[in-house]
């Protein structure tokens, strides 16, 4: 038995780790957050990209991706995490590709990234989807659920409302989903008088609509 296996068994017995199917996870959330903060200290954009690529090649890639995203999306307050996402999604980003974003794994990563640095996600989404023809937007299917959820978060934040709402409108005009929380439904919810799906005030939302109508 390796030293690693012995340590895993030791912390499982103490209840610090817990088994989840074929994987093992950290049980106390504060400790898990502390560990990812420590891990981030030594990450560069290149190393984060390599890490994501390794996950995507693993047999358990869906489980590993979801586990990573659940932890990483809690790092919105961490300057290192924000800077990493900003650089990772900057110029010549490997993620600036519609096929990558529309994949199950790629779209899930963006659901995590948007909680850490919505401005960086907004910038890249606008670059990829901003001028995409309707017929191409209609072909976005595999990752569409995650893309719409990511756009919801962009629409909610004041600093990314206009870009997020513009993209949501584009997807709504190229709708291919039938459930109520599709892009069309979520765009409509931005403009209700009471309990809108955004933190932006009514005046600013009205100005956005008038501007779109004029165009």
Label each region the model flagged:
Residues 121, 194-202:
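Flexible loop/turn segments at the boundaries of HEAT repeats in alpha-solenoid HEAT proteins
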């Amino acid at each position: 038995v390796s030293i690693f296996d012995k340590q895993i068994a030791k912390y499982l017995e103490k209840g610090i780790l817990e088994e989840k199917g074929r994987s093992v996870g950290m049980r106390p959330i504060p400790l898990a957050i502390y560990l990812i903060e420590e891990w981030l200290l030594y990450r560069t954009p290149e190393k984060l990209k390599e890490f994501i690529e390794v996950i995507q090649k693993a047999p358990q890639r869906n489980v590993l991706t979801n586990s990573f995203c659940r932890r990483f999306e809690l790092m919105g307050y961490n300057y290192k995490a924000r800077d990493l996402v900003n650089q990772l999604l900057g110029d010549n980003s490997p993620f600036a590709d519609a096929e990558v974003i529309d994949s199950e794994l790629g779209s899930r990563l963006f659901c995590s990234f948007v909680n850490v640095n919505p401005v960086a996600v907004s910038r890249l989404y606008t670059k990829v989807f901003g001028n995409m023809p309707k017929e191409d937007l209609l072909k976005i299917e595999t990752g569409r659920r995650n893309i719409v959820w990511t756009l919801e978060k962009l629409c909610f934040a004041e600093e990314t409302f206009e870009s997020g709402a513009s993209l949501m409108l584009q997807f709504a005009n190229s709708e291919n989903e039938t459930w109520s929380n599709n892009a069309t439904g979520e765009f409509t919810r931005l403009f209700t008088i009471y309990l809108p799906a955004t933190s932006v005030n009514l005046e600013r939302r009205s100005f956005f609509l008038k501007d779109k109508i004029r165009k």
